[in-house]
């Protein structure tokens, strides 16, 4: 089993994060074969081992095809390209899918979050705040959601700044759909789309707190 496939299978285990994922990935890469017994030797539960082994071959093949496209990346947590800020968080993602410019992940960033049903006051000051910072080289990072997230991304792009969108679903889906043009503009201006979830994961409500 090649390293990339190991990472893809481990990313499908929703309760596996950070140091544990990296440790298990490196250990599995050295094994001549991988089965449920071998997986449980790493500390995975039987259920987690079954999830690893049952990850669909079709999903693996489609993910590998996705990674062949320009500016499509799979970034393990031990990669030099992994965002250093994330390593300081509890239960950081063991790997990330990234579409766009990797150097944006190492830029000075401000994370902006807010209400989906914002007030005119929130929109006005959110836009002004993000525009001002973006003109000074700060990368605006948000979640591509309706409301203040969209305001933040658009404000950065309006002044030719850079913005990063961290999604609560796989990168095969832009959610909400109305923000597909916004995501495209973000990529055109040197930003990135980032997700810790497998490419086909839909926008499920319980993933958004994890994304935040």
Regions found by a protein language model. Give the residues of each.
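Short, small/acidic-rich helices and loops at N termini and domain boundaries
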Residues: 1-81
